[in-house]
Amino acid sequence: MPVDPAKLAALQKKSGAQSGGKGTPRRPGKKVAGRNISEDEKKLSATLKKFNAQEITGISEVNMFKEDGTVLHFPKVHVEGSVASNTFAISGPSQQKDIAELIPDILPQMGQDALLQLQQAAVQFSKLQEQAKKTAGGPDAAKEAGDDEIPNLVENFEDNVE
């Protein structure tokens, strides 16, 4: 079987370091990019122990309001916190919901200040929705801009060229 010396030289350059044989150091294996969830939880619990975080009982659910009008809802929540270091960890299954879905459940739990903030957020959210409809380029937006009508050609422009 004939061996092409040019191909052999190219393969030797590609191989770089020797991967085996007597007296050669072994290469370390590549680590997998995907991480295990249990490893992350172990690191988190170790960090919380450093902060001397204690489990906070009596919290049945947590709602985090986002700027885009959605809510991150934790129905079954586990809360740990350290008041001294101002650190709190919220864990558990989460769901992303719209504000309108949660308002009947949230209103009895809120205070006066929170209700005012919620009203402001609702007004701001409705303004954002109106702006999105105008910029979406729907049929109503085109009629308002006057771009819907195309003018008819009255003359033949080729006659004017001659």
From Swiss-Prot:
Annotated region (Disordered), positions in chain: 1-39, 130-162
Known role: Component of the nascent polypeptide-associated complex (NAC), a dynamic component of the ribosomal exit tunnel, protecting the emerging polypeptides from interaction with other cytoplasmic proteins to ensure appropriate nascent protein targeting. The NAC complex also promotes mitochondrial protein import by enhancing productive ribosome interactions with the outer mitochondrial membrane and blocks the inappropriate interaction of ribosomes translating non-secretory nascent polypeptides with translocation sites in the membrane of the endoplasmic reticulum.
GO cellular component, one term: cytosol
Membership in a protein family: Belongs to the NAC-beta family.
Quaternary context: Part of the nascent polypeptide-associated complex (NAC), consisting of EGD2 and EGD1. NAC associates with ribosomes via EGD1.
Protein's name according to its UniProt entry: Nascent polypeptide-associated complex subunit beta
Gene Ontology BP annotations: protein transport
Source organism per UniProt: Yarrowia lipolytica (strain CLIB 122 / E 150)
Compositional bias per record (Basic residues), positions renumbered to this chain: 24-33
Domain NAC-A/B span(s) in chain numbering: 38-103
Keywords from the UniProt entry: Cytoplasm, Nucleus, Protein transport, Repressor, Transcription, Transcription regulation, Transport
PANTHER family: TRANSCRIPTION FACTOR BTF3 FAMILY MEMBER (PTHR10351)
Transcription in keyword set: yes
